[in-house]
Amino acid sequence: MRFAGNGLTCQSCHLQAGTQQYGLPLAGVWGVFPQYIGRENEVRTLQERVNGCMERSMNGRALPVDGPEMKAIVTYVRYISEAQQVGRSLEGRGAPPLPLPARAADPERGREVFASTCASCHGEDGQGQRLEAAEAAEQGKRYQFPPLWGPDSYNDGAGMARTITAARFVHANMPVVSPGVV
């Protein structure tokens, strides 16, 4: 059964299978949950946080908390967190701070940067690069490079829909071949 409602996978945001520093890593996350989540103004479990991603970033449905898919995700997060100290947040968790510019955003300059730096992977229209059906089935994903907006991307409730979150992530991780250029 498919729970994601779009063409993204966990690795669309959590780079290198959730192990890349500043690539929204999941390594170490096991030891910081349960955790207060400001959006909900409540302490939430890791399973609840995963379902938040499923519903917003993946634009889909919540996983059954004790179902095989949730157990697999939680087991993987625990496995990649084993070397980390419980209760201690890791260096490189999230994306690094980015100073806010002292000027207004410039959409025309943004268009130029996108065309010269982003479009080669994400497409001129930002809809990503789809894989052929056989390759997609083999790799377990629909896209070589994910769409950045539209129906096969995250929804407006996702963290990446926040301009500062997206800017910090892009600045630290894009383009993939030369992070930090953008």
What are these regions (language model features)?
Residues 54-58, 152, 174, 178:
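Short amphipathic alpha-helical interaction patches enriched in hydrophobic/aromatic residues
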